[in-house]
Each structure stands twice: as C-alpha cells, then as structure tokens.
Regions:
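Accessory terminal regions of nucleic-acid processing enzymes
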Residues: 1-222
C-alpha cells in the first residue's frame, strides 16, 4: 500500500508539472479531499481534483483518480472496454466520490508498475449509484451477523492476499485472535451526530481505546 501511495504522489506531481492541467490534491484545510456519510462509518479520501482537462470546458472541475497496476492487469485494462468494466469496485468508488463532491466527470490515470506506462480515461457520473451504496452500507454497518462472503475459499484474492490465519478467519473456520468491541454483539454503531459506537450492555458510548481493548463481557458476532 505504501508503494501505491508513493506512485499516486508521483503521478500527481507529474500532472502538476504540465502547463495546461491544474491539480489540487488537498482541500482548503491542507487535507485530502474526504467524503463521509452515515456519521463517518462510510467514508473515503480522494486523490484530488483537476481543471483544464477538457479544452472545450477548461473551467470544469473533475475528480482525479490515480491507480497503479502490474503489467498483466494493465494490459487487461488496455484491451478491455473501459476502466469501469476493468474494476467494478473502483468504478463504484469514483461514482460515490463524484456524487459526494457534486462533480460530473472523473479523470482516471492508471500507472503501469512494470514500465511506467500510463492509461487515461474520462468517466461520466451515473446517477443513483451513491444512494444505492449508502443503502447497502447502512445494511452492512447495522448488521448483527457477519455478511456472507462474496468470494469462495479458493478465489485468487483469498489465496494470494491473505495469510493462512486470515483465510481461516475469513472462511469462518477459526475465530480472530483479537477481542474488541467492533466484533461484539453488545456494541452498536451510532449513525447520528458525530457517530462513534456505543455499548448496549453498559448503555454508554465507547471511545476508540476502549473499543480496541474490549472487555470480559464480549460475545462474538456470529
């Protein structure tokens, strides 16, 4: 992930060096542009925004999305129909960001980690995606049992990116090592105001330190 962040920073720096494109990677407070919903339980940060991309509408502000990929994945992207077809997860991500920031289009830049090649595409917003994802996120956040896995135990994402221990937990063959309030039946996310979590066993809010520590009254979500 650290390598990916460095690559994203390098791509942003290269865009800034271009005379015609104006890039803003940070908001007026000097922080990443952040989109937050459901009292912070459904949130994410963007790579920034850009202007002067489309010569027909130079003042249009677009979302900037930077990703990196190995050579095989990069070739799949180039040979495919579009960025959104290449990765449905990334597609949903930018659709949510565009709606949250009231933007109509995204400039996508994908960096090839093998040969430094670049793929670019401009993507239009699709109405209704954010509302659909907020509804889905609410259902997951408030769920009292773990959601069903979208991937089988033999899926390459499970085999490649998870340790044996993580695979066992993911496949419900073993409990996690760490007890905390987030995996306890007594806890409940607060979706109003500043958000946070509360304990229904002791009827009080739980700060982050206490969430991580858990307690002897812990009961696993199952």
């Amino acid at each position: 992930f650290d390598l990916g962040n460095r690559i994203e920073d390098q791509v942003v720096d290269r865009l800034k060096q271009m005379e015609n494109i104006k890039v803003s990677a940070l908001d007026k407070d000097g922080k990443q542009y952040r989109c937050s919903f459901l009292a912070g339980h459904f949130a994410g940060s963007t790579d920034g925004v850009v202007k002067n991309v489309d010569p027909k509408n130079p003042e249009e502000v677009m979302l900037l999305e930077v990703k990196s990929a190995n050579n095989n994945r990069f070739n799949e992207l180039q040979q495919g129909e579009s960025y959104e077809q290449w990765s449905s997860n990334y597609a949903i991500q930018i659709q949510c960001y565009m709606a949250a920031l009231n933007l109509s289009r995204t400039l996508v830049v994908v960096y090839n980690k093998n040969d430094s090649g670049l793929y670019t595409e401009i993507i239009d917003i699709r109405e209704g995606v954010l509302d659909e994802m907020k509804q889905k996120a609410r259902q997951i956040i408030l769920a009292r049992t773990p959601p069903e896995s979208p991937y089988s135990s033999t899926d390459y994402r499970i085999k490649k990116f998870m340790s044996a221990k993580e695979q066992a937990v993911y496949n419900l063959e073993q409990l996690p090592d760490n007890v905390n309030c987030r995996n306890c039946k007594h806890s409940e996310p607060i979706l109003e105001g500043d958000g946070g979590w509360r304990c229904n066993k002791f009827n009080k809010p739980i700060d982050e330190a206490k969430q991580r520590a858990g307690c002897e009254q812990h009961i696993w979500l199952s």
